[in-house]
Amino acid sequence: MKIIKIGIILLIFAFSLSLLIFSYLYFNGLSGIAQTSTPEPGQIKVACIGDSITYGHGIKNWPKNNYPVLLQELMGDSYHVQSFGVSGRAVHDNSDQPYRALPHYEESIAYDADIIIFMMGSNDTKPENWFGEEAFKTALLDLLDDYTQGEKKPAIYLCTTPACFFMEDSEGELTSHDLRPAYADIIAEIVRQAAEELGYPVIDIHALTTENPQWFVKDGVHPNNEGAAAIAQAVSGAIIQ
C-alpha cells in the first residue's frame, strides 16, 4: 500500500511538473503549437507567412500578444488573420530548415488568402544558410510566386525582416541563434528591391526596428510584446490606408 501511495504521489508530481513546463512554453511562445481558426463567409483572409518572429517566439502571454493576433484585433471582424509562422524556417530550399518543407507551407497555400503578409529571411543570415545575394533573391521570388498560382491573385505585402542586435557579452559577427546583423541589412535591401520589381507594397520593419533595440527580448533577435505591437500597427496601417 505504501508503495502504491508513493507511486501515486510521483505520478501527480510528474503530471504537475509537465503541466508547469508546458504552460511556460505555451505562454512564452516556445511550444510550437499553432493557433488556428476557421474564417467566416465573407471575411477577407489575411495570411501571415514567416518564421519565429511571426510565430511570436518569446512573447509573454503569447496567445494574446503575438503580432498576427494583435493584427486581427486592429483589422476587425471583416478580416480573418491566420498565422503561418514557424520557428527556425528560412526562405532558401537548401537551408537547414526550409519553409517549403513544412505542412504549414502547404496549408498557407490552401488557405487561399486574399492578402499575404510575408516576413521571412532572418534565418537565411546564418552562415550555413547563406548562398549569396542572388541565390537568396531567386529563392525569395520563387517562394512568393507559389502564392500567385491559384485563380485568386492575393495582394502581397513584403515585410523586410526586423533588425537583430548583439547581446552585451557577444563577440564576432553572430548574434544569439547564429544570426548575422550585417546580412540582415543585406536581406532587407533585397526584399525592398524585390518589392519594387514585383510591384508589391513594402512594409519596412527593418527600418522601423533598427533604432529600437528595446523592442526585443534579451536574445536581441525576437521582438518582445512592444515590438510585436509595433509590427502589427505597421502592417495594419499598410493594409488600411
Regions found by a protein language model. Name each.
Residues 43-47, 53-141:
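Conserved SGNH/GDSL esterase-like catalytic core that processes O-acyl groups on lipids
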Residues 1-49, 53-62, 72-78, 110-111, ...:
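N-terminal secretory targeting modules
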Residues 20-32, 55-66, 95-102, 185-195:
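Short, mixed-charge, low-aromatic patches
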Residues 5, 100-241:
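Alpha-helical cap/lid subdomain in secreted, periplasmic
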Residues 36-38, 65, 95, 159, ...:
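Compositionally biased, intrinsically disordered/low-complexity regions enriched for serine, proline
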Residues 38, 73-75, 85, 148-150, ...:
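A generic structural signal for short, solvent-exposed coil/turn residues
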Residues 38-40, 62, 67, 153, ...:
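Intrinsic-disorder/low-complexity coil detector
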